[in-house]
Amino acid sequence: MTSGFDYIVVGGGSAGCVLAARLSENPSVRVCLIEAGRRDTHPLIHMPVGFAKMTTGPHTWDLLTEPQKHANNRQIPYVQGRILGGGSSINAEVFTRGHPSDFDRWAAEGADGWSFRDVQKYFIRSEGNAVFSGTWHGTNGPLGVSNLAEPNPTSRAFVQSCQEMGLPYNPDFNGASQEGAGIYQMTIRNNRRCSTAVGYLRPALGRKNLTVVTRALVLKIVFNGTRATGVQYIANGTLNTAEASQEIVVTAGAIGTPKLMMLSGVGPAAHLRENGIPVVQDLPGVGENLQDHFGVDIVAELKTDESFDKYRKLHWMLWAGLEYTMFRSGPVASNVVEGGAFWYSDPSSGVPDLQFHFLAEAGAEAGVTSVPKGASGITLNSYVLRPKSRGTVRLRSADPRVNPMVDPNFLGDPADLETSAEGVRLSYEMFSQPSLEKHIRKTCFFSGKQPTMQMYRDYAREHGRTSYHPTCTCKMGRDDMSVVDPRLKVHGLEGIRICDSSVMPSLLGSNTNAATIMISERAADFIQGNA
């Protein structure tokens, strides 16, 4: 079946939902959004606490990294959203933008017009903050942002412990200063998750000029010479072609976008030929430059049941469910990842190079160590904000149904190992401060030992994992390894742009969802001629 549109958006994740909603605001254009996953109807998606159950299962791509030779040759689960809203529907809802210097660095790296001064207004446009306003925040945007009403006592103790070891208290990591410790702001509105599927796409679903196709596997982008003209996909067992008279915008994420580009004949020519794919455009940077935050968790068992682990017990679980159903409050209204900090591995660094996430629970996410059954615990995750290691995304096969080879090359640069080890050391020190130590029975792995830097290095190699922030695989710029120009147009091609975290020239010093949304807001202006 063939159908025609002005714009086709390929991928209904954080970026795609924003772009489809913005483009369809113009009633004179026809917009089609194509998503491989399902609609966001599962109730756990919309409960803030539900993220812990969303890191595995049918709403994610079943990805596994290649063996990580610098991380004990482990294959690491690599969670990516496969649902309307993408990562914004399954992430931990932490709202951080990055340091202003990150965007100034983008501009210096060849992304002309992407300095913080250039992009700040797009952050503000997207944000509907229920607490902050003024120069740094927006209050009328589609993306709901708020403070937690009732942080867990252990989260408050974490913030106090950070202050006891010299970190300043910071009520707003997206304000004038990033450094310090505090309680994160969340993409939560009225105690429910506010994904881009909720904040942007849902209000647009009634528009007659917007078509949303879900559970659709995109096979390739169709080209007429060097002009993108359509998209082939399978839905309900039927082969379909959607044609675009204006543009196709690929928003499939930092793993899905390079995969689709290569399947369509755009990428490193030799690799495409190895897989029997005719070359449309030789772009060696497609799938290169993969950057991600390598997170390392330490876990402690508590003396009491103050953390959210107690809600694993049936009577407490029922009580929490009842409280949320009746009042939209209580533990179900928490994202669990409540506390956070930005700090330095090297005090002489100009900006923080480590980020910490405090979880008022142990083993909340799939694959992370828990505490003995019936006990309560806490988790502290740390990661290097601007790693030097670079990885790749490559085709395993020309079959679109086959997942690509994902090699983040974690710890490939020795400097990343040293900074990761320092993050573990600081995490252990945070657990050792009076405000937290009084709650802790023992710290798993390090209990009864006098840890050394070599122990921290070994621990990072054995227990580190993705922080779900892959970026930069179709980077923006002017150099030979860039894939798109500063207006997100693919080099050497017509009628096609890329708009997602893959276009970032380098990884941000924070979570990446807010910046991905900002990129989409800006892309909408580019396409509509407003910038």
Swiss-Prot record:
Catalytic activity field: L-sorbopyranose + A = 1-dehydro-L-sorbose + AH2
Lineage of the species this protein comes from: Bacteria, Pseudomonadati, Pseudomonadota, Alphaproteobacteria, Acetobacterales
Claim: Oxidoreductase is one of the keywords in the record: yes
PANTHER family noted in UniProt: CHOLINE DEHYDROGENASE, MITOCHONDRIAL (PTHR11552:SF147), GLUCOSE-METHANOL-CHOLINE GMC OXIDOREDUCTASE (PTHR11552)
Pfam families, sorted: GMC_oxred_C, GMC_oxred_N
Enzyme class: oxidoreductase
Stated family: Belongs to the GMC oxidoreductase family.
Gene3D superfamilies, per the entry: FAD/NAD(P)-binding domain, Glucose Oxidase, domain 3
InterPro entries on file: FAD/NAD-bd_sf, GMC_OxRdtase, GMC_OxRdtase_N, GMC_OxRtase_C
PROSITE patterns referenced in this protein's UniProt entry, alphabetically: GMC_OXRED_1, GMC_OXRED_2
Active-site residues (renumbered): 469 (proton acceptor)
EC annotation from Swiss-Prot or TrEMBL: 1.1.99.32
SUPFAM superfamilies for the chain: FAD-linked reductases, C-terminal domain, FAD/NAD(P)-binding domain
Named cofactor requirement(s): FAD
GO molecular function: flavin adenine dinucleotide binding; oxidoreductase activity, acting on CH-OH group of donors
Keyword Glycoprotein: no
Domain of life where this protein originates: Bacteria
Keywords on record: FAD, Flavoprotein, Oxidoreductase
Protein name (database record): L-sorbose 1-dehydrogenase
